[in-house]
Each structure stands twice: as structure tokens, then as C-alpha cells.
């Protein structure tokens, strides 16, 4: 979770998100991303972002494509908003959300990769693997 602590107003990535405070950040995961999703949800809410958590509501085993599709469908009618998708490795849910032409999901492993995916590739979904983040 070191990357979450690095976020602050002086960070260029965070500055880019400032305009997003008026839009929504959708969160989705499978059971393997449940804990990280909760941490991110609390962090975003504490920093005054509008957050909609698409689930799951419990840490029971669920299928990542179901929640990836939920996230993609929310973004379909809301091009100003973005999403964060989480599963164990990030790979499965990344494949699931990238099936839709309006989604540009980037599986990232560093703050710099996240910043560049937004800046250079106009990524609208950040994908993380809970089992791969220390």
C-alpha cells in the first residue's frame, strides 16, 4: 500500500484527478480484490471523491467477469467518470473490462505507470492485482 501513501496534492497524478472529483470513480473487484478495494474506497472518500462501489459486498468467491462487466456498463453512459478494477493478479478483470470498446483499462504496477496510462493512453480504468501489491 506504499503507493497510496504517496498520493498528495503536489503529485501530478493526483492533480489530474482533481477534476475528477466532480465525476464518479466506480470500484469493482472479485473476492481476491475485496480488501484492497475497501482500502481504496476509504482513501478516495476521505479525499472527497465521489465513489460508487459495485461490489462484491462480501469476501465470498465470485467471478471477476461479472464485476468487470458491471464496471464497464457504468462507464458506457458516463464518459467523464473512471473506474478501478481489482482481482488477485489484475489480469482476469483487466481482460473482462477491456472487452468493451469504451473501456481503456490499464493494469499497472507502479504510480508512474498509472500516471502515464492516464496521461498518454487516456486510460479510464485502473487495474490492480491485490496479491501483487505490497
Q: What residue ranges belong to the model's regions?
A:
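Extreme N-terminal starter segment of soluble prokaryotic enzymes
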Residues: 21-25
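C-terminal binding/interaction regions
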Residues: 26-28, 32-35, 111-134
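Short, solvent-exposed amphipathic alpha-helices that sit
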Residues: 35-46
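A short beta-strand-loop structural module common to alpha/beta enzyme folds
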Residues: 50-61
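Short, structured active-site "lid" loops
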Residues: 66-85, 89
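Short Gly/Thr/Asp-enriched flexible loops that form oxyanion-binding sites at enzyme active sites
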Residues: 92-103, 112
Amino acid at each position: 500500500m506504499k503507493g497510496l501513501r504517496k498520493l498528495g496534492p503536489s503529485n501530478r497524478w493526483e492533480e489530474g484527478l482533481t477534476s475528477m472529483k466532480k465525476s464518479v470513480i466506480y470500484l469493482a473487484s472479485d473476492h481476491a480484490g475485496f480488501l484492497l478495494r475497501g482500502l481504496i474506497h476509504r482513501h478516495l472518500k476521505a479525499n472527497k471523491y465521489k465513489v460508487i462501489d459495485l461490489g462484491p459486498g462480501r469476501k465470498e468467491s465470485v467471478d471477476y467477469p461479472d464485476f468487470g462487466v458491471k464496471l464497464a456498463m457504468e462507464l458506457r453512459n458516463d464518459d467523464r467518470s473512471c473506474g478501478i478494477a481489482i482481482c488477485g493478479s489484475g489480469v482476469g478483470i483487466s481482460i473482462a473490462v477491456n472487452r468493451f470498446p469504451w473501456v481503456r483499462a490499464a493494469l499497472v504496477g507502479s504510480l508512474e505507470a498509472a500516471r502515464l496510462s492516464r496521461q498518454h493512453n487516456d486510460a479510464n480504468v485502473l487495474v490492480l492485482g491485490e496479491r501483487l501489491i505490497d
